[in-house]
UniProtKB/Swiss-Prot annotation:
Coiled coil: none
Superkingdom in the source lineage: Bacteria
UniProt keyword Ribosomal protein present: no
EC number: 3.6.1.40
Name this polypeptide is given: Guanosine-5'-triphosphate,3'-diphosphate pyrophosphatase
Pathway of action: Purine metabolism; ppGpp biosynthesis; ppGpp from GTP: step 2/2
GO biological process: guanosine pentaphosphate catabolic process; guanosine tetraphosphate biosynthetic process; nucleobase-containing small molecule interconversion
Biological function: Catalyzes the conversion of pppGpp to ppGpp. Guanosine pentaphosphate (pppGpp) is a cytoplasmic signaling molecule which together with ppGpp controls the 'stringent response', an adaptive process that allows bacteria to respond to amino acid starvation, resulting in the coordinated regulation of numerous cellular activities.
InterPro entries referenced in this protein's UniProt entry, alphabetically: ATPase_NBD, GppA/Ppx_hydrolase, Guo-5TP_3DP_PyrP, Ppx_GppA_C, Ppx_GppA_N, PyroPPase_GppA_Ppx
An example Gene Ontology molecular-function term: guanosine-5'-triphosphate,3'-diphosphate diphosphatase activity
Family: Belongs to the GppA/Ppx family. GppA subfamily.
Length: 499
């Protein structure tokens, strides 16, 4: 592999140090490695903002690991930035001099506003959804809030509060009491107050979180089978659970890793304050943040309007998927869905996810025809799909698993991107679109009429179509049977003759 295609971004954060190494492939990035170490630099700041020798040593120790990996990468393709703690520390120069010596490359201490801008760029390049967004990143010693549309930011703020500093300030006794949470939330709201009106003025259609706290929340909700949207009600539930645990060392929540537990309550308190103060309805996890912003900045890649479409095109090219057939199936699925508008109300996101599944439905053939749906589900579950959240990936994988043959109803109910009934509806539409497009020619697609009464589907085919297409008739009969096994009613008529 040519080293000139390699890029590295290192973020010396207040809680963790991160390194991202990527390879540029045809205008997009392929992640080669991610290394993260909990350094808790902010915990080493005293009341005079002097960084302790122990904290500096923890940081240098981590950088020695990173340095080994950087030897393979041209210096012009490496960016190392330091954030809140090293902005604050009065003896930052001492740490930075040795850090640069260890890494053999300059370390740039970036301003809070520049950090916010880079975070937004990382989100814009990797996260799907509406263009107008609010981005929230809770770090160890600072919290960034950014509004923007497309690639352009409209307001940028970096606030002096973070999960490590709030831990030391409001949970220093390690007690998870209502009083400690109330103090932490009130302090966070006070910090937010001067900027709240500006953020509300610029507005947003979607809110995304790009921090360890939000990642932890996502993992908790996935583990507990909840849908992936973070809401204030869910945050309050988790706060009550933390209070029940009593002490930080006894904090146990299903899905919360030991590594994230220490700063989880303080991050949770800050997030509750942000939700309350800004009246946020729901938040999802961003696909990238500061490090991705650094990498895309080095590559000078423009932000695409539709990240999901770019991802699907890249995957189709990589796995040599027949794009004409994928489009044929997607067009048919869209046509079938449009006929059910009055009866099956699917929101625009559900429709997009159905069409994404259509785009990738033959990916399993790149492994083998035998067990192709299982191969497809495995690949989608394990591929990096910028623009899609973990729950959305799981839904697409589940739809592909159930695209033909026997239906695994439990898998459709276990995904958490959409309600189970919606997943069933998407699955039925995908199966019918694949079945009727199987001849791989537009001129052979029958004029299908589809109607729904609750969960009963009635499929009307042109007169004599079944008689003239014996294989097609057999496939339709088999599909009716597969659907009946999971108590889905599919009634087929040909002209005026019901079957």
């Amino acid at each position: 592999m040519s080293s000139t295609s390699l890029y590295a971004a290192i973020d010396l954060g207040s809680n963790s140090f991160h390194m991202l190494v990527v390879r540029e492939v045809a205008g997009s990035i392929q992640t080669l490695s991610r290394i993260k170490r909990k350094v808790r630099l902010a915990a080493g700041l005293n009341s005079d903002n002097t960084l302790s020798a122990e904290a500096m040593e923890r940081g240098w120790q981590c950088l020695r690991l990173f340095a080994e990996r950087l030897q393979d990468i041209p210096p012009t393709q490496i960016r190392v930035v330091a954030t809140a703690t090293l902005r604050l520390a009065v003896n930052a120069e001492e740490f930075l001099a040795k850090a640069q010596e260890i890494l053999g490359t300059p370390v740039q201490v970036i301003s809070g506003e520049e950090e916010a801008r880079l975070i937004y760029q990382g989100v814009a390049h990797t996260t799907g959804g509406a263009d107008q967004r609010l981005v929230v990143d809770i770090g160890g010693a600072s919290t960034e809030l950014v509004t923007g549309t497309g690639a352009q930011t409209t307001s940028l703020f970096s606030l002096s509060m973070g999960c490590v500093t709030w831990l030391e300030r409001y949970f220093a006794d390690r007690s998870l009491t209502k009083e400690n949470f109330d103090l932490a939330e009130a302090a966070a709201r006070e910090v937010l107050l001067p900027i709240a009106d500006v953020l509300r003025y610029h507005g947003w259609k979607v809110c995304v979180g790009a921090s360890g706290t939000v990642q932890a929340l996502q993992e908790i909700m996935m583990a507990q089978g909840m849908d992936e949207r973070i809401t204030l009600a869910k945050l309050q539930q988790l706060k009550q659970r933390a209070i029940q645990c009593g002490r930080l060392e006894e904090l146990e929540i299903e899905g919360l890793t030991l590594e994230r537990a220490l700063v989880f309550p303080s991050g949770l308190a800050i997030l509750i304050a942000i939700f309350s103060e800004l009246n946020i309805q729901c938040m999802t996890l961003a696909g990238g943040a500061l490090r991705e912003g650094l990498v895309y900045g080095m590559l000078h890649l423009s932000v695409e309007q539709d990240i999901r479409s770019r991802t699907l095109r890249n995957i189709q090219r990589r796995f040599m998927i027949d794009t004409e057939q994928a489009q044929r199936v997607a067009s048919l699925a869209s046509h079938l869905l449009s006929q059910l508008d009055g009866s099956w109300e699917l929101d625009p996101l559900s429709r997009d996810l159905l069409l994404s599944a259509c785009s990738l439905h033959e990916i399993g053939l790149s492994v083998d025809f035998k067990r192709a749906p299982q191969h497809a589900a495995y690949l989608v579950n394990n591929l990096d799909l910028p623009g899609f959240t973990p729950a959305q990936k799981k839904l697409i994988a589940t739809l592909l698993l159930n695209q033909t043959n026997a239906i695994d109803l439990s898998s459709l109910h276990q995904q958490n991107a959409v309600p189970p009934r919606v997943a069933e509806h998407l699955c039925r539409l995908l199966r019918l679109a694949i079945l009727f497009a199987s001849r791989r020619r537009d001129d052979l697609l029958p004029a299908i009429q589809l109607a729904a009464h609750d969960d009963q589907l009635t499929l009307t085919l042109p007169e004599n179509w079944l008689a003239e297409h014996p294989l097609g008739r057999e496939m339709v009969d088999q599909e009716c049977q597969w659907q009946s096994y999971v108590h889905w009613t599919l009634r087929v008529t040909s002209g005026d003759t019901p079957r």
